[in-house]
Amino acid sequence: MRLILLLSLFVVAFAAELPLAEECDETKCLLPRCRCSSTNIPGGLAPRDVPQFVSVTFDDAVNVINIETYREVLYGRSNSNGCPAGATFYVSHEYTNYVLVNELYNRGYEVSLHSMTHQTPQTYWAEADYDVLVKEFADQKSLMSHFALIPDQEIRGVRLPFLQMNGNASFQMMADSGLVYDNSWPTVSHVNPGLWPYTLDYASIHDCIVPPCPSASIPGPWVIPMISWSDLNGSPCSMADSCYFTPPLDDENAWYNFILTNFERHYHGNRAPFGFYIHEWYLAVNPAVKAALVRFMNYVNNLNDAFMVNANQIIEWVQNPIPVSEYIRRPCRRFSSTPCRATSCGPLRSEHNGLDYWMQVCNTCPRVYPWLGNPLGR
């Protein structure tokens, strides 16, 4: 209780520098730049006319081990409209192989930010000020663009470590750094119907599960709510691998039905985006869960009105909502691939802990291992 009080005092102090968000005025908060937090479908569409977006995401470092899972379960997939199926990777820096990050980007998947350090304790993230968050995320954007050869403007999203909210500071950092959306904020109160993405121009109805949550008016960044699943006991879980009462981990059919039940709450409801949020290790140690995910993605890829997409594609649709009958006729997403000249670097001394690291990059080698305050390792 004392921790929550301290965190609340911290966010109030920071918010003093920013205007307090007021109740949303729908006559002033208009697409494409502003949207009130609401379970109402963008554009006033009927549920049957809404494309059901599915957001498959993976967190943490990309390496030679987990890339095998990504290649196995994701590569070569297409939605029913013929466009490539998307997924989003929230990448943390330490131990990441940037040649493989480049591979994911060139396959059309979205690469977003999960911090430079992903350090513990969790209170570090709750208490981090604006300057710390610039070093953790804005500098990571520069690092990712440089070493994985991803165009700076293609790196758009953030997921805070441990889903630990930070009040206003993280969103202010995003607004100043050209970052488009956050996908860290769980909701257990706005699940059925689900909470659609929105901006922070005005006060949010979003329940604050991991305080402190933003209180200021911060135009620019979007929130993609992490709409919780319900486990077999009816308890909420923000990520698939955080559910407590699950089917047996060796029962593929039971897990498939578990995923499908949570999906259908969206699909037969207001069609707010459905998230399958997970860490790769959970699939690696539970082959039946991996097989269930593959079956579920196969199912989605054969539905005429459901689409696996990158997270930013959800924001783009919300900004310009069109019926599914039009959506399926739109051209597929286009982007410029960036060929990588793979370079192995190391040993690189880390100035933060004195250890030696090896890096795989698509650029010239850094002098030292990149870290806070020195994202390019110069």
Residue ranges and their predicted role:
Residues 197-266:
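Aromatic-lined glycan-binding groove of carbohydrate-active enzymes
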Residues 122-126, 235-237:
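Short acidic, glycine/proline-rich loop/turn micro-motifs
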Residues 126-129, 195-202, 323-325:
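Short low-complexity, flexible loop/linker segments enriched in glycine and/or proline
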Residues 17-112, 117-122, 130-136, 141-146, ...:
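Active-site beta->alpha N-cap acidic-glycine motif
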